[in-house]
């Protein structure tokens, strides 16, 4: 994997985002028990096994510097299971409570109607704007129009809810 600084820009932004939230939580809870650690909930929504692996790698990179300062919980959901109403609804509720949602997919892929429906359900359940949405893509591909359309849609979902939106490209982990 290319270890360039640019490759980890979104991860660094998320670390900063978490650090700011951690600082805010610490300031708000000055009188509470010192053993209480802030909890960060993360939901990964992934297209397939390779996308799930990339997302988990990205998640590990983001939390590496912060794991001693706060607790993290992680839920992983595959695009395909989101189409099952009971599972999709459970995933949407969990993701609505998440501090950040990582959507990991292939650059060439368009979001299916079922995945877009799920994104609309999820975004409709967000109560506050303290979340972040991360679009995690594999290495650059040829179909720029497809990814631009998908990223534009995701940015609009985030903008409607007033949540932070990040994009990140991660290179194929199998080439390491």
What do these predicted regions represent?
Residues 2-39, 114-119, 176:
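Short N-terminal or domain-adjacent regulatory/targeting segments
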Residues 25-63:
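A short, flexible N-terminal coil/short beta segment enriched in small residues
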Residues 38-43, 100-102, 128-138, 164-166:
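Hydrophobic beta-strand segments of well-ordered beta-sheets in folded domains
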Residues 49-51, 81-84, 103-112, 139-144:
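Short acidic, S/G/P-rich loop/turn micro-motifs used as interaction or catalytic elements
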Residues 65-82:
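A short beta-strand-loop structural module common to alpha/beta enzyme folds
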Residues 109-130:
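A short, gly/pro- and small-residue-rich
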Residues 141-172:
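Short, glycine-/small-residue-rich phosphate/pyrophosphate-handling segment
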């Amino acid at each position: 994997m290319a270890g360039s600084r640019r490759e980890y820009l979104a991860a660094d932004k998320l670390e900063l985002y978490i650090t700011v939230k951690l600082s805010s939580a610490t300031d708000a809870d000055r009188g509470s028990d010192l053993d209480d650690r802030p909890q960060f909930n993360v939901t990964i929504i992934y297209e397939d096994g390779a996308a799930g692996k990339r997302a988990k790698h990205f998640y590990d990179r983001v939390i590496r510097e912060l794991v001693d300062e706060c607790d993290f919980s992680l839920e992983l959901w595959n695009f395909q299971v989101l189409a099952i109403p009971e599972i999709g609804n459970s995933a949407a509720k969990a993701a609505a409570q998440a501090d950040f949602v990582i959507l990991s997919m292939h650059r060439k892929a368009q979001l299916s109607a079922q995945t877009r429906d799920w994104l609309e359900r999820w975004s409709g359940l967000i109560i506050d704007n303290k979340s972040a949405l991360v679009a995690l893509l594999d290495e650059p591909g040829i179909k720029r129009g497809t990814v631009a359309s998908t990223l534009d849609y995701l940015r609009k979902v985030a903008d409607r809810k007033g949540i932070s939106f990040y994009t990140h490209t991660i290179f194929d982990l199998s080439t390491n």
